[in-house]
């Protein structure tokens, strides 16, 4: 049925992580008509590749779930094109990601708040919104850092496989600490991770926010609805046109909110004449607002896997045997338990790569299995691996449309490894990871390094390996960043979430982040959307909560850490 001439108070372009939050929160006002337009299909309850946590590797690269983006040839990665999976389904990338929940370090948000006009995005103002969205089963009811009644149900990784405990102990032996909660008082250290898995199923943003709200009469959700154009009268957005089932539909809107993510949002802005004027003219597009920051400041996390052979038969490697998969799948279908009921990213840590760094700049994900994200397993009977990479690369990329065609994918480049600081941190990251994996606590299991292998030792050999094997951690952000109007590269007003120079066009998604955070970015995107919902609705914001958190050089180095007995063989 065509929605031609139908009018909505809010049209949200994108039913991903941020769009799901907004669809729920904005439709709480019963007198407001809300439309969510998702270009992908529905996240069906019966779809095992979405709902089964351990099936997370299957949607990537599959056109039914993934937009299958790729960068242009990366000039500092040997000319490689780096594949980028983005969710083409309700829930967006929260329906195909690794389900890891990490807020980032509190100092990330202190950095957000440094520019004039960004003061309400410091940690004290963001913390109440993190708590609002969380239901943290792994935290004590009195834990003032964590939320206990939110829609996102979080499972604390049990990390019962002996490889996890040995890895945590190895971190302590290497001179680091163990922390009870990387989202609590102390991020720095090693310990279990929270995951967006509830009762053995993926807890996506759409499952948590959008599906419970769909019974409301004032909320409409359209899937397979690809927005081709935003309509304007001067500086005011008046509606959108979208294509569904081969037909074009035009609807009117009092407000248009872009929640398409770090790729689609800057693409739509540029197609709408919002961006660098000279570049837009070169593509035959009449400039509407000159905002040279659209598509710039692009950030991402790059990562590699350091893989080891495991001497003891304790890893999950046998679960990759195709003969065992039917049993594992049936166990999950009937009981929601077993190897398929976990994302297996149950623990890891955050450390500083050197003593000059104020707070952690390296992230580790540990897996009791040796396998690539595409499902390619190492040729060993048993293995394990650690994912590692710098969190604050100062390399910056860009996204630029290639033409006026909304269906043509844009030109994407992240410029990985383009700075000396970036390369320095990468060498440190690999050396820190190897040091941890070589500690005595790992001796009972350490059967030797598979990848990159002992032949990779010098700084240049390490960088060559990263250039060959580095993959995106799938955390693109900051391509339409928040910032005051005095910042020539800012795109979004941090007080209103409106695009600078526009009256009723807003951006709420990862593209609006001013800087990436230390960790997986799904939790920060949910927080940003929760906070933005109050801004858009004109509600009084939640009261800031000024709570002390661990700072290196300020607190005792052991404060908030768990005492671990030294490993004794």
Swiss-Prot record:
Cited HAMAP family: Choline_dehydrogen
GO molecular function: betaine-aldehyde dehydrogenase (NAD+) activity; choline dehydrogenase activity; flavin adenine dinucleotide binding
Cofactor: FAD
Protein name (Swiss-Prot/TrEMBL): Oxygen-dependent choline dehydrogenase
Transmembrane segments: none
EC number: 1.1.99.1, 1.2.1.8
Protein family according to the UniProt entry: Belongs to the GMC oxidoreductase family.
Keyword Membrane: no
Pathway participation: Amine and polyamine biosynthesis; betaine biosynthesis via choline pathway; betaine aldehyde from choline (cytochrome c reductase route): step 1/1
Active site (record annotation): 475
Source taxonomy: Bacteria, Bacillati, Bacillota, Bacilli, Bacillales
GO cellular component, one term: membrane
UniProt keyword list: FAD, Flavoprotein, NAD, Oxidoreductase
Role description: Involved in the biosynthesis of the osmoprotectant glycine betaine. Catalyzes the oxidation of choline to betaine aldehyde and betaine aldehyde to glycine betaine at the same rate.
Keyword Flavoprotein: yes
Catalyzed reactions per annotation: choline + A = betaine aldehyde + AH2; betaine aldehyde + NAD(+) + H2O = glycine betaine + NADH + 2 H(+)
Sites where the protein binds FAD: 9-38
Gene name linked to the record: betA
């Amino acid at each position: 049925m065509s929605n031609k001439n139908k009018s909505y108070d809010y049209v949200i372009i994108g039913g991903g992580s941020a769009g799901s939050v907004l669809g729920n929160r904005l439709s709480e006002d019963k007198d407001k008509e809300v439309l969510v337009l998702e270009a992908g299909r529905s996240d069906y309850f019966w779809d095992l590749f979405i709902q089964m946590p351990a099936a997370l590797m299957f949607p990537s690269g599959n056109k039914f779930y993934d937009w299958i983006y790729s960068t242009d040839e990366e000039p500092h990665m040997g000319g490689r094109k780096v594949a980028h999976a983005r969710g083409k389904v309700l829930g967006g990338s929260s329906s195909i990601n690794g389900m890891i929940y990490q807020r980032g370090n509190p100092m990330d948000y202190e950095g957000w708040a440094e520019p004039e006009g960004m003061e309400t995005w410091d940690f004290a103002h963001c913390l109440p919104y993190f708590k609002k969205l969380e239901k943290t089963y792994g935290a004590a009811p009195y834990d003032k850092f964590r939320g206990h009644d939110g829609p996102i149900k979080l499972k604390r990784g049990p990390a019962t496989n002996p490889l996890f405990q040995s890895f945590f102990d190895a971190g302590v032996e290497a001179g680091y600490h163990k922390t009870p909660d990387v989202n609590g008082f102390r991020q720095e250290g090693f310990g279990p991770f929270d995951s967006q898995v509830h009762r053995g199923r993926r807890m996506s943003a759409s499952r948590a926010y959008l599906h419970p709200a769909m019974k409301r009469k004032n909320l409409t959700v359209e899937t397979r609805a690809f927005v081709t154009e935003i309509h304007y009268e001067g500086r005011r957005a008046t509606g959108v046109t979208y294509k569904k089932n081969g037909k074009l539909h035009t609807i009117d809107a009092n407000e248009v909110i872009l929640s398409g993510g770090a790729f689609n949002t800057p693409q739509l802005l540029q197609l709408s004449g919002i961006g660098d004027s000279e570049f837009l003219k070169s593509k035959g597009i009449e400039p509407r607002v000159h905002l040279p920051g659209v598509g710039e400041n692009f950030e991402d996390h790059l990562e590699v896997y350091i893989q080891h052979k495991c001497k003891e038969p304790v890893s999950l490697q046998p679960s990759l045997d195709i003969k065992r998969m039917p049993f594992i799948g049936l166990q999950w279908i009937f009981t929601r338990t077993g190897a398929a009921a976990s994302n297996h990213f149950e623990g890891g840590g955050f450390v500083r790569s050197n003593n000059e760094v104020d707070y952690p700049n390296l992230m580790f994900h540990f897996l009791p299995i040796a396998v690539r994200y595409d499902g390619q397993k190492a040729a060993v009977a048993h293995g394990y691996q650690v994912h590692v990479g710098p969190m604050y690369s100062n390399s910056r990329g860009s996204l630029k449309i290639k033409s006026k065609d909304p269906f043509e994918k844009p030109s994407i480049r992240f410029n990985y490894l383009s700075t000396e600081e970036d390369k320095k941190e990468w060498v440190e990251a690999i050396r820190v990871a190897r040091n941890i994996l070589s500690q005595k606590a790992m001796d009972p299991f350490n059967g030797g390094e598979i990848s990159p292998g002992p032949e990779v030792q010098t700084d240049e050999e390490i960088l060559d390996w990263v250039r060959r094997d580095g993959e995106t951690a799938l955390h693109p952000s900051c391509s339409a960043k928040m910032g005051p109007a005095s910042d020539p590269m800012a795109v979004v007003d941090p007080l209103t979430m409106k695009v600078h120079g526009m009256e009723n066009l807003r951006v709420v998604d990862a593209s609006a982040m001013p800087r990436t955070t230390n960790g997986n970015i799904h939790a920060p995107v949910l927080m940003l959307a929760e906070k933005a919902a109050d801004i858009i609705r004109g509600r009084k914001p939640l009261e800031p909560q000024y709570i002390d958190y661990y700072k290196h050089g300020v607190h005792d180095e052991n404060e908030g850490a768990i005492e671990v007995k030294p490993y004794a063989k």
